[in-house]
Amino acid sequence: MRNSNRLFINSQLGFIITLVAVLVMSACSINVKKNENGEDKKVDIETPVGGLHVSKNADVRDTGLPVYPGARVKQKDDNGEEKSANVNISSGLFGLKVVAIEYESDDPPEKLITYYADKLKKYGSVLECHGSSNDDDVDVNEHDSKDSNKLKCKGNNTGNKVELKVGTEDNQRIVAVQPAEKGKGSTFALVYVQTRGKDTI
């Protein structure tokens, strides 16, 4: 008798889950905007529980930082990978916003580091971290104490890539500067990350 009740409850539960999934998906709205070349430039997805918005046309004003004088937006690489993005995920439980844009400059990294260390000061104490060009140091961690919300340098803090960080784990601005791969000059990224929720994503 218990097994038949459990089987009945499981089948009812399965039916309810399927019904909810169908209702959620049918209430889902997807909007894709393309550029003049037919490439996707903006995607908006709305569901009853939240939304996802992705745009390849990030606006530098959303980072809260100026563009270094004379710098140029870095073009797509050989793989066709975009060099800017604006991602926004929102729901009643959590949210995540990331704005990132890559640039290149003819000036050496030291000049850019000095420039952005000064510009970041208005947001608080600036942390300087060092790493290799393979390190991606944007961390959004669950924090269990007030100290764990502070920004930190990761790894052994050595290398030719410099990251200037300001803010907290759930509201940070990052400038990542490194020597250009070919020739002289620099490449750099301006990044803004904001999260919200009981436990950070």
Feature-to-residue mapping (PLM):
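Bacterial N-terminal signal peptides
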Residues: G14-M25
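An acidic-aromatic pocket/loop used at catalytic or ligand-binding sites
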Residues: R2-Q12, C28-I201
